[in-house]
């Protein structure tokens, strides 16, 4: 057997073809050290993998490409860091630094996510059903057709989009009705990209002077419609109803909003 599927923490196959090779391999994380678990994932020849009993192991799917991975449990920090083309689905919550420097692919989280989600993200899509912690989308950046997207179904903590340089951050606030779905100091140091907040409430008073806010028009809603529909399809929501609501957009107010901070020649 090329992958030792029947021993050392690998469960029996759920389904198989004529020669006995299963369509989806299952790996039990349990109390395995993260290095051992990640080695099994990285060397597995199968295109589809299910991870069972995941409990805090770090760096899962780090730099991985070309696979579909389903995670049962709670992965540790830096899930999908440097991800390069995988489809990863977490049936639970995730912790900090999820999607750190993610390059491409899709990460879906059926729960909440911790701090610094999408740190330095430069491509791909992260879909979070629930809330996200502090500093989500910090240092996000885009280049030509590489445009990162972070969609949050609930609300975001403070310092959302800190130093954002590109891409889209979309916070839907589906569980928030009496306040904007964002914490203190959103868009601090923002100099590129866009933040969309679905809300009828006033914006926080501490948006930086270098950042402008306005109500999204139809053209701007059309920009994010594909991402909202992708989110709605994953989590069973009504995309048309979401897009019909009011969105506020945060954008930097010039190509160099921090000119006054530097000495000019």
Which residues does each PLM region occupy?
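Short, small-residue-biased leader/transition segments that mark boundaries at the very start
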Residues: 1-3
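Feature marks extracellular polysaccharide-active and adherence modules
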Residues: 52, 72-74, 81-82, 91, ...
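The right-handed parallel beta-helix/beta-solenoid scaffold, focusing on the short coil/turn
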Residues: 47-49, 57-59, 67, 77-79, ...
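Thiamine diphosphate
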Residues: 133-148, 152, 157-162, 175-189, ...
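OB-fold/S1-family RNA-binding modules
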Residues: 8-15
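N-terminal, Lys/Arg-enriched amphipathic/low-complexity engagement segments
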Residues: 20-69, 77
């Amino acid at each position: 057997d090329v992958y030792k599927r029947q021993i050392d923490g690998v469960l029996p196959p759920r389904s198989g073809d004529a020669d006995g090779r299963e369509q989806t391999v299952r790996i039990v994380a349990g109390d395995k050290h993260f290095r051992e678990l990640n080695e099994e994932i990285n060397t597995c020849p199968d295109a589809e993998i299910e991870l069972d009993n995941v409990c805090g192991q770090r760096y899962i799917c780090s730099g991985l490409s070309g696979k579909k991975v389903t995670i049962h449990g709670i992965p540790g920090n830096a899930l999908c860091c440097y991800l390069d083309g995988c489809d990863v689905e977490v049936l639970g919550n995730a912790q900090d630094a999820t999607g750190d420097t993610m390059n491409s692919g899709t990460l879906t989280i059926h729960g909440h996510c911790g701090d610094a989600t999408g740190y330095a993200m430069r491509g791909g899509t992260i879909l979070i059903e629930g809330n996200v912690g502090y500093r989500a989308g910090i240092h996000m950046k885009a280049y030509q057709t590489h445009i990162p997207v972070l969609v949050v179904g609930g609300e975001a903590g403070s310092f959302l989009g800190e130093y954002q340089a590109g891409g889209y951050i979309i916070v839907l606030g589906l569980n928030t009705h009496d306040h904007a779905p964002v914490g203190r100091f959103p868009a601090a140091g923002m100099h590129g990209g866009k933040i969309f907040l679905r809300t009828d409430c006033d914006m926080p008073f501490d948006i930086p002077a270098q950042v402008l806010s306005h109500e999204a028009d139809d053209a701007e809603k059309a920009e994010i419609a594909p991402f909202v529909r992708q989110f709605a399809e994953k989590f069973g929501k009504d995309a048309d109803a979401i897009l019909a609501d009011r969105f506020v957009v945060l954008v930097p107010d010039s190509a160099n909003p921090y000119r006054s901070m530097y000495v000019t020649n």
